[in-house]
């Protein structure tokens, strides 16, 4: 260990020019280069897993021919009054429910489709 400490002390006492000359001599003696080695890029990071959507919006696209049944279903689903439900149905496309889970969105779509409406889930 004493030899290593002596080498460290000698290297520490070198000037910048002497250290540069030492590097050149070591490169030629060992057949290496002190240039930074370019690190090859690793494989591309795996694409982030696609998060499954947890909140859905049920959109009434078209009320269809049976508006009265669709209005009744809209009232049952949303709790809106008769006028508000009628305005929603006649103003299609409109959001019926927002921020519902997948099962509820599917159930609402099935109810409205059974009443004659065209429904989208977004």
Swiss-Prot record:
GO molecular function terms listed in the Swiss-Prot or TrEMBL record: mRNA binding; structural constituent of ribosome
> Has the keyword NADP been applied to this entry?
no
Write out the entry's keywords from A to Z: Ribonucleoprotein, Ribosomal protein
Instruction: Kindly indicate where the leader peptide sits in this chain.
Output: none
Question: What CDD domains is this protein classified in?
Answer: Ribosomal_L7_L12
A Pfam family cross-referenced in the UniProt record is Ribosomal_L12_N
Is Cytoplasm one of the keywords UniProt gives this record? no
What domain of life is recorded for the organism? Bacteria
One of the protein's GO biological processes: translation
Q: Which family does it belong to?
A: Belongs to the bacterial ribosomal protein bL12 family.
> PANTHER family per the record?
39S RIBOSOMAL PROTEIN L12 (PTHR45987), LARGE RIBOSOMAL SUBUNIT PROTEIN BL12M (PTHR45987:SF4)
Q: How does it assemble?
A: Homodimer. Part of the ribosomal stalk of the 50S ribosomal subunit. Forms a multimeric L10(L12)X complex, where L10 forms an elongated spine to which 2 to 4 L12 dimers bind in a sequential fashion. Binds GTP-bound translation factors.
**Could you tell me what this protein does?**
Forms part of the ribosomal stalk which helps the ribosome interact with GTP-bound translation factors. Is thus essential for accurate translation.
Name-wise, this protein is: Large ribosomal subunit protein bL12
């Amino acid at each position: 260990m004493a030899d290593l400490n002596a080498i460290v002390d000698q290297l520490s006492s070198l000037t910048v020019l002497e250290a540069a000359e030492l590097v050149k001599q070591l490169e030629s003696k060992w057949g290496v280069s002190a240039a930074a080695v370019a690190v090859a890029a690793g494989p591309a990071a795996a694409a982030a897993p696609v998060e499954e959507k947890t909140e859905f919006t049920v959109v009434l696209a078209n009320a269809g021919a049976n508006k009265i049944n669709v209005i009744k279903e809209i009232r049952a689903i949303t709790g809106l009054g008769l006028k508000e439900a009628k305005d929603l149905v006649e103003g299609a496309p409109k959001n019926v429910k927002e921020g519902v889970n997948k099962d509820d969105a599917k159930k609402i779509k099935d109810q409205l489709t059974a009443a004659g409406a065209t429904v989208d889930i977004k």
